């Protein structure tokens, strides 16, 4: 059960809708304080063997679902050596081409060890905040962030320097866990309904 909190007379750093067993005020920190951020790269396409392998190489157009299991293009182990190998559970967002509505604000969580292109930014938690919580936060705010803060003339992009400064309010680990399970369940039901439709 989720209850509505009346914050009219008391300014708290908490959401209006909340599980009733949690009463503590949420803390706030910047993304850079809570996550390590990594951008990717593209192995040279002049060497055709680079794209003949089984290592995930995620591009910005693939971040439409909650979880990403396999990328459209796979690279070789040799090509992957020059890139950052991201662990399972890494949150990845699109940072290039944000003038396009279908790309702006998109992000997914990896279900396999993966590498990424330079059009993506990856986030791994330092411990305070789970990647699943960041996914939920970005799902709510990512589109507005792209519209307001992306830079560039023809192509609108976000950068490390922009993203690391954003402040996030977050609950304790127990409340994060319950919220993450609840949101994952909602996403699963939405995905099931979309398949039926």
Residue map of PLM features:
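A short glycine-rich beta-alpha junction/loop motif
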Residues: 11, 113-121, 151-174
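Sequence-specific dsDNA recognition surfaces
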Residues: 32-46, 59-90
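Short amphipathic coiled-coil heptad-repeat segments
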Residues: 1-24, 192-197
């Amino acid at each position: 059960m989720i209850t509505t909190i009346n914050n009219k007379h008391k300014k708290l750093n908490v959401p209006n809708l909340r599980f009733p067993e949690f009463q503590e005020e949420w803390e706030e920190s910047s993304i850079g304080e809570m996550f390590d951020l990594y951008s990717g790269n593209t192995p040279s396409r002049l060497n055709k063997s680079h794209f003949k392998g089984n290592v995930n190489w995620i591009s910005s157009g693939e971040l439409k679902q909650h979880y990403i299991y396999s990328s459209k293009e796979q690279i070789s182990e040799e090509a992957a050596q020059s890139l950052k190998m991201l662990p399972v559970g890494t949150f990845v967002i699109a940072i290039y081409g944000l003038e396009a509505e279908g790309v702006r604000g998109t992000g997914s969580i990896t279900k396999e060890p993966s590498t990424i292109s330079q059009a993506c930014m990856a986030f791994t938690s330092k411990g305070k905040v789970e990647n699943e919580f960041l996914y939920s936060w970005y799902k709510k705010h990512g589109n507005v962030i792209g519209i307001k803060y992306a830079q560039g003339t023809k192509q609108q992009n976000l950068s490390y320097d922009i993203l690391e400064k954003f402040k996030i309010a977050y609950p304790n680990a127990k409340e994060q866990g319950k919220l993450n399970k609840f949101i994952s369940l909602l996403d699963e039901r939405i995905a099931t309904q979309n398949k039926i439709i």
